[in-house]
């Protein structure tokens, strides 16, 4: 499909573009729009594709691969199914590649890009590529409750070089449910009334992977990372993330690992009291974390990076506490704290480590007022 195209749908559960495999036919389905099939497709002036949906539960572009007998391709991301057990006998691939264009959705739970598949298990490896969507130089706007820009359920979505705006309540930049992979590269994203990335699951044994790469910027009204999944891995490289709520991580349940490299992170880290819930955060290569409020992580590694417990911004000190429930590792790390020089009851930032510490870390303490105890 080449050239300038316009696709408009007006009904509930409608689809702009669909790549689908199902049943016993082990045959791949691949749709390409203005793409030459390469990793970096070439574009021609005017070769834009515009997709607009107006209806609830609609999808702009959808790759669907055997989502289960109790689920349809356009079933909502978190619609439950007793058949969604995490295995697939059909290895056929549904793939949709779109280069250069715009996707706009209007309606409740109307996603711009949706990869809806069933994981293929190979030993201990989980493969979520049987349903995949790749968007390059595409801009996304969604209007509606829970109208996530990117949705993946045991599928893979890659977004490269574009802008994302979600305007409706609880509409995230991206959400993964019951496992999957999302990659954001050269992406500017704003979730005006939702979270940045939502990672959730209703079944055990599934993994969620998110890569935020190459100068991407994510801003959200609520937390950047909402986590309620068994196992998730998030990589942030050469990028910035922040939220209007000043919350970076909200880990309700499960094991969440976040690796930030040469990136700027703003917002607190929250974790539930569930003993099986853990947050492992690693900062490297000149990354900064401005925690903004009391924060808790399980493990923290600060490698040639900086953590601002609070900043010397001229305001009165509001004591902030960073709690590390397990271990801390420093490699030329820096921790910035503020304290009032007074008696034992003076306001001060704190770092509390319940486990072991290792490596080298410098603490930079700024006087927030006072001249010492007498």
Where in the sequence are the language-model features?
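Right-handed parallel beta-helix/beta-solenoid
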Residues: 9-10, 18-32, 62-95, 114-132, ...
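Extracellular beta-solenoid/beta-roll
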Residues: 207, 217-221, 227-362, 366-367, ...
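Beta-strand-rich solenoid/repeat architectures in extracellular/passenger domains
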Residues: 1-13, 29-57, 79-111, 130-146, ...
